[in-house]
Amino acid sequence: FKTGHSLIKARMKETHSPLGGEMSGHIFFKERWFGFDDGTYAGCRLLEILSRSADPSAVLNALPTSHSTPELNVTCAEGEPHRLTTELQALAAGTFAAPAQINTIDGLRVDWPDGFGLIRASNTTPVLVLRFEGHTPEALARIEAAMLALLHRVKPDAQVGSAAH
């Protein structure tokens, strides 16, 4: 589904999810809160959940490890991000073979067994937003290179920079 706090909250309501979040670190709770995200509250709720376990370290150690980029941006002209996203989506099927799985719900997301790449148009500014994740540093490097190669096919002058948050 698409990113953005209002869209995440709507999806949580639709699916009756008690918890939702984004890679940006925004975490939303359905119960015992006012529906907006708050880092301190999220941390306290995590501690509450961990306190119910006889071995909190085991709970955390059971979580998958991954390597990811920060949010990356490509500055574009007004209206360009959506056009570029459409072009990327059209090229993806001929570029990425199985076991890659292509998702075009919100930009272009390509999932591999060992990670994913995402390029999407920002909903608020004229930029492309990029995120890459791999189970290992090598997987991350391979996925990032593959996605950037595709991006440079539709925008050869793309300069990737870290998001200014």
Show the residue positions of the predicted features.
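Phosphate-binding and adjacent anionic-ligand microenvironments
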Residues: 1-131, 136-165
